[in-house]
């Protein structure tokens, strides 16, 4: 009996159970194999850069934090760094250390969120809940240090907020909880790599080769999963990280497993950085804020940092009235999504959302641009 091939389109989203954030995925299929894919973003467009134009730098630092709830700290850190460099503002070393500690805690909770989401997409609910259970102590630590679990408001121009100063009496307890987190993470990693069902879904699936990754400018763990060194912390863009010993994690296979493995092992490196930072804090000067600064006019300057998903870029200048001009913000998800869109053809429909999830997309960070064609949005 002859069966005719089915050719058609499957539209997923913008709201779907496998999506943490809204986007629209169009899959053009032949039977159950993807022949072409189109990823549509922009559902959450809010025009952040336009809103920032003409505001004082103190206000845009608050606004930048609202760009994303998962990586809010890195946005504020980059934002205030532009003003600090443009106005030659000295930041106390203790403040820089605490900024880095909070960022690495944020990296841990973000990576654990991805693991939970990835297991959920795979259909392994038990592993998903385990990932979130391991993540919870990190959220509690962030809440204790900053007063918030999602919006931390830690960096300010010239330092950090007083409430975010880490008391030396709390350091031993924090180190103990980090050690427990590390033990639980090792168990989760061991359980993952030794489960043949999980590995069959993520090994040799969604392969992004090094050439394509370079061509489409993959960033962060997505690039490092394809053998590309891309960590801004190791490239001298964030001077405070020169005080810490840690490794840049790179895998060469470029598949879903490699992208997840980079994040797994990055968690151990983040714990290493936090541990060093906490142990060094008692030896640093007690100052956390430099109030003796003056805003001055400067042309747009560039600032880079390494967010959980890759390179974050901020640029703006101040006019003669101390108002922000020419704001540009670039987050890593846009180029990483282009990579995922390029490698979807040839895969089974059931692998589509998993492949996209493997680059850990943050659509809230990405949706700041809108396309206008013939005066129509």
Curated annotation (Swiss-Prot):
Identification of the protein by name: Uncharacterized protein MJ1027
PROSITE patterns assigned to the protein according to its UniProt record, in alphabetical order: NI_HGENASE_L_1
Superkingdom as given in the UniProt entry: Archaea
Family indicated by similarity: Belongs to the complex I 49 kDa subunit family.
Gene3D superfamilies: Cytochrome-c3 Hydrogenase, chain B
One Pfam assignment: NiFeSe_Hases
Species this protein is from: Methanocaldococcus jannaschii (strain ATCC 43067 / DSM 2661 / JAL-1 / JCM 10045 / NBRC 100440)
GO molecular function: ferredoxin hydrogenase activity; NAD binding; nickel cation binding; oxidoreductase activity, acting on NAD(P)H; quinone binding
InterPro entries xref list: ComplexI_49kDa-like, NADH_Q_OxRdtase_suD, Ni-dep_hyd_lsu, Ni-dep_hyd_lsu_Ni_BS, NiFe-Hase_large
Keywords: Oxidoreductase
């Amino acid at each position: 009996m002859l069966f005719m091939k089915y050719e058609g389109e499957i539209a997923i989203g913008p709201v779907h159970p496998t999506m943490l954030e809204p986007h629209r995925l169009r899959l053009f299929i032949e039977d159950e194999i993807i022949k072409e894919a189109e990823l549509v973003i922009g559902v959450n467009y809010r025009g952040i850069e336009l809103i920032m134009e003409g505001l004082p730098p103190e206000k845009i630092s608050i606004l930048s934090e609202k760009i994303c709830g998962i990586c809010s700290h890195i946005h504020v850190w980059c934002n205030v760094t532009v003003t600090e460099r443009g106005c030659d503002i000295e930041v106390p070393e203790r403040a820089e250390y605490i900024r880095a500690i909070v960022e690495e805690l944020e990296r841990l909770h973000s990576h654990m969120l991805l693991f939970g989401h990835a297991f959920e997409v795979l259909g392994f609910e038990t592993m998903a809940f385990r990932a979130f259970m391991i993540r919870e102590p990190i959220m509690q630590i962030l809440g204790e240090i900053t007063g918030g679990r999602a919006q931390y408001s830690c960096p300010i121009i010239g330092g950090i907020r007083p409430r975010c100063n880490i008391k030396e009496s709390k350091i031993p307890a924090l180190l103990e909880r980090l050690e427990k987190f590390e033990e639980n993470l090792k168990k989760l990693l061991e359980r993952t790599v030794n489960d043949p069902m999980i590995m069959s879904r993520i090994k040799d699936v969604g392969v992004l080769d090094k050439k394509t990754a370079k061509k489409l400018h993959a960033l962060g763990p997505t690039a490092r999963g394809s053998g590309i060194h891309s960590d801004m912390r190791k490239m001298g863009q964030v001077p405070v990280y020169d005080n810490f010993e840690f490794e840049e994690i790179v895998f060469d296979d470029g598949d879903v497993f490699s992208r997840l493995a980079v994040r797994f092992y990055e968690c151990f490196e983040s714990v290493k950085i936090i541990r060093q930072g906490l142990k060094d804090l008692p030896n640093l000067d007690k100052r956390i804020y430099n109030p003796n600064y003056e805003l001055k006019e400067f042309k747009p300057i560039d600032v880079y940092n390494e967010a959980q998903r890759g390179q974050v870029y901020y640029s703006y200048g101040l006019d003669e009235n101390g108002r922000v001009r020419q704001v540009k913000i670039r987050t890593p998800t846009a180029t990483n999504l282009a990579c995922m869109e390029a490698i979807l053809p040839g895969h089974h429909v059931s692998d589509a959302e998993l492949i996209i999830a493997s680059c850990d997309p943050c659509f809230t960070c990405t949706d700041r641009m809108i396309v206008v064609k013939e005066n129509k949005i």
